[in-house]
Amino acid sequence: MATYKSLTEADLLAFSTGLIAGVDEVGRGPLVGDVVTAAVILDPNKPISGLNDSKKLSEKRREALFDEICDKALCYHVGRASPAEIDELNILHATMLAMQRAVAGLNIAPELVLVDGNRSPIFVAHNGAGLTSHSIIKGDGLIASISAASIIAKVTRDREMDVLDAAYPQYGFAKHKGYPTKAHFEAIAEHGVFDQYRKSFKPVKALLEL
């Protein structure tokens, strides 16, 4: 597995292969909820304009692109790791596990997997075949399939935080999405934590030890 930093290298790599799955994650930093990943194989005959790192897009634009990706992609799959798995494995290894689940869930086996960042786990397709993978630093802004994966993962997790907000409105999940903000710290100090919290994360662990 190699790590690429430049768009030129990534483009040459991409153009030399067949079907490519882009993989990205969201939710490594929050104190609550799953870490969510997505794997997307785009259809080269159905281009999608405006793909970019999900963090650089407005919520409205992400939602529109989410629907377009779901409609036009050859296939996509969401993988996740639970708070319990995060606590057991640590957030890095749980994220790698979630990425593996996303790729294994694709109903088409890609020839190559491109992962955002500087790390990539070992991937196996749904048919048991091993897959070649490379990591692309800032790939979510460079490679269309990774951008698409970042959008699928981001919208999926944000929607889950909205559901959690409806169940626990006193925590403000719809606003901070579970990230460690001042308002979130104040909420857990007042109301405590529940089973969706990552108990190995320092702020949560400190509260439980009081």
From Swiss-Prot:
Reactions catalysed according to its record: Endonucleolytic cleavage to 5'-phosphomonoester
Domain RNase H type-2: from-to ranges: 18-210
GO terms of biological process kind: DNA replication, removal of RNA primer; mismatch repair
Classification via Gene3D superfamilies: Ribonuclease H-like superfamily/Ribonuclease H
E.C. number(s) listed in UniProt: 3.1.26.4
GO molecular function, a single term: RNA-DNA hybrid ribonuclease activity
Protein location: Cytoplasm
Cofactor(s) of this protein: Mn(2+); Mg(2+)
Sites where the protein binds a divalent metal cation: D24, E25, D116
Database matches in SUPFAM superfamilies: Ribonuclease H-like
UniProt key word GTP-binding: no
Domain of life (superkingdom): Bacteria
Keyword Protease: no
Co-factor: note: Manganese or magnesium. Binds 1 divalent metal ion per monomer in the absence of substrate. May bind a second metal ion after substrate binding.
Role played: Endonuclease that specifically degrades the RNA of RNA-DNA hybrids.
Protein known as: Ribonuclease HII
Species for this entry: Shewanella baltica (strain OS195)
Name of the coding gene: rnhB
